[in-house]
Amino acid sequence: MAFEPKEPQKELKYNELRIYSDEELHNYTEEELKNFKIKHNVPMCDDLESGPWPSFVADAKREALHRRKLGKEKLMIERDVVEDLLGQLERSFEHGETHWKHGGIVGVFGYGGGVIGRYSDLQEEFPSIAHFHTMRVNQPASKFYNSDYLRTLCDLWEYRGSGMMNFHGSTGDIIFLGTFTEQLEPIFYELTHVLQQDLGGSGSNLRTPSCCIGKARCEWACYDTQDMCYEMTYHYQDELHRPAFPYKFKFKFDGCPNCCVASIARADMSFIGTWRDNIRIDQKAVQAYIGGEIIPNAGAHRGRDWGKFDIDKEVIDLCPTKCMWMEGGKLMIDDKECTRCMHCINVMPQALWPGKETGVSILVGAKAPILEGAQMSLLTIPFMKAEYPYDNIKNNVIEPIWEWWMEEGKNRERLGELIQRQGIQKLIQILNIPAMPQMVKEPRSNPYIFWKSEDVPGGFKRDIKDYRSRHKR
């Protein structure tokens, strides 16, 4: 089925929207850059330009020179913003502490997220960054861009912001680094009305959903990651723009177990493509790999001579559940023991494919260290069909978990920490699902078993008021 956007789309033409001419965009020479000095003395920042790696300081100096030559009449905030930024960074290196402070909540009308307020506590020394707010822009699914869009975006931020951007933040957003409060509403208007792009999430809300390239270009995608990401973004607009959660919540959509957006490590709820039937095998292609007729790993490791392909060492022995073996010249797989790691498929992509009955595995609880340590996602739903409009997932998984988390979660407590605190048993109860071996971390050490009346033949009744009338505290 062809993709149908929820809103009418228009084609952007940079030449109709551009703010700067080609001469203004390319307004300095490499010789000028070599001789350029910013207005602050920043020896430690300068030192970061040395060495073999690309330097953000070198990039910042290019932008500083570009803005200085553009002049104030072509910019809506101070032209020295990047120079002052490097100056304050040098002070932070000298003092061993940050010089950004929180001075209150800033944002755009109607939204509780999308803007991260940032103010300098050295405003007299660095007035151009007295305000230096960050804006998060909701990226297109799978980060597909064309040149007209990117150039228009860059012109807008050059004109109304610092000109510095980050492609992309760890959640996936386009990051606009540094502008003044007065520019937030005009930028938001241009983004939404001209570029048809929304702000992303920030604060204690649903963060911008992010997905891999999916069926657009990847043969292994087991569901349409872009469609699901788009639908969840639209369906949960209120949760994305108006913070109501105990803390942040992230969706990430991986089309297959290769996990190209690392959802298993970075998302409160990970959707990883999988299959529930058997891996498909082309035995002739298996023999072609063994005989050296087909290069393993699709040629990805051709940088050196690894010797003749050995299916035992490179595939069978590396299977985490040891569910593969050769028998009579054929590759055999015990699919009920397969853990869907994709290793064998990655090594022999012309011989093995995922099954035909595809869907998603849903995992919950990954996070970085906040209240507790970092942790990976917990497999919660081994298989679920993922088909538009995804009501089975919304109604049976997402919303029951949110209801529990918003009721029971402490301030700044991620979902994974709530599960740590209240136990996996509570999660199982909320979702009304059976326990699985994957949920067992270690043998139990608590000698007591707490039975529910429905678990005991004949049941039992317990009147706590009657008990307390006879046994005072």
Question: Where does each model-flagged region fall?
Answer:
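Charge-rich, low-complexity segments
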Residues: A2-D121
